[in-house]
Amino acid sequence: MNGEPHLMSVMVPCLMKTVSGGQVRSIALGHPLLDDYLEFVAARARPNTLIAVAYDLKVFFTVIVKQPADITTADVLTFIKAQRAPRRGAGVLRLEDGEAGLSARTIKRRLASVSGLFGYLIARADAGVNANPVPRGLATRGRRGRAGVRGAPLIRAPRTLPRVLEPAEADAFVAALRTQRDRAMVAAMLLGGLRRCEVLGLRLPDLRPGERRVFVADGKGGRQRIVPISARFFSAVAAYYDSERPRTSSTETVFVVLKGPRRGQPLSAAGLDEIIEGARKRAGLTHLTCHQLRHTCFTRLREAGMALEAIQAQAGHASIESTRVYLHLANDWLAGEYLRAAEAIDAQSVRS
């Protein structure tokens, strides 16, 4: 392989990470070209994106043990087949997409990571890579036997609607929360639509109780926004600061650990997930995530008549296409719109 390291000896189970101040600053797989690409990604993407790309590449080159310049489209198709292989015993299918093995969304993400690597190597022009082995789709034939420019997607990811909480479920869940801190965090998601990472990233200067708004300094994709939020959130935060938050905590982060050796330190994502899971069980709910609280917030806002563009701004969506899902989730709003339109049509028919 012209002196290049053999990938089998490089793709070790653990990624090599450099952590500074709790954030991943760099990550490596031990192969020069792959590590150069990861440095390129690190300069342009967020730490979680970097980790995901590195893991996807690790998986790909563990399955396809070749140098990047030797990878072909046939290898990519072999990788897809391997990812579709059952992981939990023969004949086990995923309910959400009717396929065995990993979900279509996971495989599509991994293919995107691999495609990004080869796009980078092509641009470098010194890696011996002249074409991207990840095809955009499978060629199909047009009508009348002509070769069509259309392509069938390599992976079909089902478009599924996220589940939202019914009002009674939301009430039971909130009642099962044990501290003012927990009530404030849930209110941020359920009433303001904040993401989990945005809740955990809130600092005291970000809170604007007089305006009933919070400043999201580090949203998805690094985007900032100001989010209006219910007075119930600020009431819970005030009660949390008055009676629960350790006075000795020196961090500006709003939500901190209340007990144990990490008392006063910023609450972690795992810690918040544990809080949500405990309240879910006490409320007798079968399934609940932080993102489900966010979906519930925007669905209820849409049902209450909030414009789709306003929900997009509240959610921090880069594209309104991401927001359109709440048109389908807001069943009461959709039914009302249909009935109004149907009544107008019926009235026109009667007049004619």
Segments from the language model and where they lie:
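Basic, Lys/Arg- and aromatic-enriched nucleic-acid-binding interface segment
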Residues: 163, 167-196, 221-223, 248
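Short, basic (Lys/Arg/His-rich) helix/loop patches that form interaction surfaces
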Residues: 227, 273-313
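Catalytic-site neighborhood detector that most strongly recognizes the C-terminal catalytic loop/helix
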Residues: 218, 315, 320-340
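Active-site/catalytic core of tyrosine-dependent DNA strand-transfer enzymes
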Residues: 231-285
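N-terminal core-binding DNA-recognition domain of tyrosine recombinases/integrases
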Residues: 34-48, 55-151
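Conserved tyrosine-mediated DNA breakage-rejoining catalytic core shared by Y-recombinases
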Residues: 197, 201-235, 242
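Long, amphipathic, Lys/Arg-enriched alpha-helical "connector/arm" segment
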Residues: 93-99, 147-180
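C-terminal secondary-structure termini that scaffold catalytic or DNA-interacting sites
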Residues: 2-21, 341-352
